[in-house]
Amino acid sequence: MPTWIIIVIIIFSLLTLFVVLSYLKLKKATNDTGSFNLLHLSDSDFQKTISKGVTLVDFWADWCMPCKLLGPTISNLADNNADKAKVAKLNIETYQKIAAINGISSIPTVVVFKNGKEVERSVSVKPKHYYQSMIDKALNK
């Protein structure tokens, strides 16, 4: 067998191994990095939480890989904004009624509320500075 074929097979095998390991790592990832400032909303506290001040809510589900990628960013935003805005998560599988009321059809969806009213919405994963600018705009309105 020619040397170049062996090299191609080795490179392909290593690439395949990298992809599989990356997938398995992401699959095991959690959506929550354990921030003490991050709120976990439910049917009983959703409306009360968003009714005063600025609240960023991440609508997510356990099976959503992009949601898992976004999890650490949301936790970081919660820590960085603890003194000026609330940052929260709502599992759409557990609280489907709240998701439906808010028109959530794709996830991850991040919505910023100010005094109970939606002021901005973003669907899909964006960089941290994008979500921070959403919070900052709502605070300055």
Which residues does each predicted region cover?
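N-terminal targeting signals for export/organelle localization
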Residues: M1-S35
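The canonical Cys-X-X-Cys-His
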Residues: C64-C67, V110
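Short acidic-hydrophobic, aromatic-tinged amphipathic segments that line or gate anion-handling sites
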Residues: L38-S44
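Short active-site neighborhood of thiol/selenol oxidoreductases, capturing the structured segment around
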Residues: I50-D62
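Structural microenvironment flanking redox-active thiols in thiol-disulfide oxidoreductases
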Residues: A88-A100
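Non-catalytic, surface beta->alpha helical segment in thiol-disulfide oxidoreductase systems
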Residues: S106, V111-K141
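Hydrophobic beta-strand anchors of alpha/beta hydrolase catalytic cores
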Residues: L56-V57, V87, V110
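Typically the conserved alpha-helix immediately C-terminal to a functionally engaged Cys/Sec
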Residues: P66-A82
